[in-house]
Amino acid sequence: SLITQLYREQIHNVDGEGLGILIFDYKGDYNESKTDFVNATNATILKPYHLPFNPLALVKSSVFKPLLPTHTANAFKDTLSKVYNLGPKQQATLLQCIMDAYTVSGINPGNPATWDEEAPTFDQVYQRYANDEEIKKGDSLAAALDKLHMFQVFEANPSNTKSLFEILSGVVVIDLSGYDADIQSLIVAITLDLFYSQMQAAGSSKMDGNYRQL
């Protein structure tokens, strides 16, 4: 397959830099049952259970971005809202819960010196939502958050999370087979959003003449 060929030829990348290849596997075409593929690529298989990255982690780039926690919270809110069709009030509630979780973690959006504090995870946001008796439950926001919490999609302990760039060493497969379409869509959207943010922070890859590092 193309993936296997890329994996085998990565030594020819500029500076011999290893490739990180991420596969969203909707049908189970690349999971543990496909031993030939796994053995040929030494692939890491992840399930949508305690995924080891934090969608609320703050990714700082060389170009300063004011109010980074607010932008990060808003991006997560937007992604969840699109997948679950949340209304304006529900979006505002979710955004406030995320911002409250940042505050409890010692992160102040207006103070960049606090941005290196450990970012809250989805589980911490969910606990704030679930324990706030003033928030009206029983709507689509509750259904969305309850489902993500019930399936334990994201790692709850921030100390056990890594950046996507750290995780993407070699071939990494997120096995989405057997999960509902909404969970599949959310995981893909959040992962790509996070990957884009980290790519921006990392900057352009190295050029060697007419060749760019992959």
Residue ranges of model-derived segments:
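P-loop NTPase motor domains
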Residues: 2-214
